[in-house]
From Swiss-Prot:
Pfam families: His_biosynth. The active site is at D8 (proton acceptor), D130 (proton donor). Its EC number is 5.3.1.16. The lineage of its organism: Bacteria, Pseudomonadati, Pseudomonadota, Gammaproteobacteria, Cellvibrionales. The keyword Isomerase applies. Its main location: cytoplasm. Keywords: Amino-acid biosynthesis, Cytoplasm, Histidine biosynthesis, Isomerase. This is 1-(5-phosphoribosyl)-5-[(5-phosphoribosylamino)methylideneamino] imidazole-4-carboxamide isomerase. Belongs to the HisA/HisF family.
């Protein structure tokens, strides 16, 4: 199980939102490339980037910063989410050196788009499912749909989606602990590996997720916890490697 540091980009800065609210953000760094260096130095093997402006505008806004990080660390697998709604955007990021793109809102509203993109860019497509009480939320979490997250996962099973980033939005950025049961339910709904996101606070969460990792959980994204120091990224990864 990989520990995946998150760098959330807003107006070129590295921030964290609480429950996805753009006006409730904390700036952690105005140099995202240097921020990435900190996690690389601690041994991170994958980086999770989010273009927050892009998620709300539906097109890349912080693409220049993403490209700069990818160029600075060419051997590091990077996944990017936020505002990915077209083949042109996916191509832009992959050519910039990003390994995987995360399709969120469009995956819910237009599942055929995921099917098509998996064919066009095999092995590079991740689906981001953000859920509240099991129901999928879209458009930067502004809308909650009538689609169940587990049903959508089953739909993408045949498409060749490389993984699902599953976020429990009630817990994201709140430091209240990860929703292990909801993550396990998602992992067992399909054969697609699941990356847990939202609410990871300390080693207790890592231990709880790792204990269930054999059910299909391949990674854990952490943001606020590693920035505020309640979780040590290197220690968490060492624990996952040893157990």
């Amino acid at each position: 199980m990989l520990i995946i540091p998150a760098i959330d980009l807003k107006d070129g800065q590295c921030v964290r939102l609480r429950q996805g609210l753009m006006d409730d953000s904390t700036v952690f760094s105005d140099d995202p490339v240097a921020m990435a260096r900190q996690w690389v130095d601690q041994g991170c093997r994958r980086l999770h980037l989010v273009d927050l402006n892009g998620a709300f505008e539906g097109k890349p806004v912080n693409g220049g910063v993403v490209t700069a990080i990818a160029k600075a660390y060419p051997g590091l697998p990077i996944q990017i989410g936020g505002g990915i709604r077209s083949a042109a955007t996916i191509e832009y990021y992959l050519q910039a050196g990003v390994q995987s793109v995360i399709i969120g809102t469009k995956a819910v509203k237009e599942p055929q788009f995921v099917t098509d993109m998996c064919k066009a860019f095999p092995g590079h497509i991740i689906v981001g499912l953000d859920a509240k009480d099991g129901w999928v939320a879209t458009d930067g979490w502004a809308e909650v749909s009538n689609v169940q997250a587990t049903e959508l996962a089953k739909r993408f099973e045949q498409d060749g989606v490389s993984s699902i980033v599953y976020t429990d939005i009630a817990r994201d950025g709140m430091m209240q602990g990860v929703n292990v049961q909801a993550t396990v339910t998602m992992a067992q709904a399909s054969s697609i590996p699941v990356i847990a996101s939202g609410g990871i606070t300390n080693m207790d969460d890592i231990r709880a997720l790792k204990a269930e990792a054999h059910k299909g959980i391949c990674g854990a994204i952490t943001g606020r916890a590693i920035y505020e120091g309640t979780l040590n990224m290197a220690e968490a990864q060492a624990y996952c490697d040893a157990n």
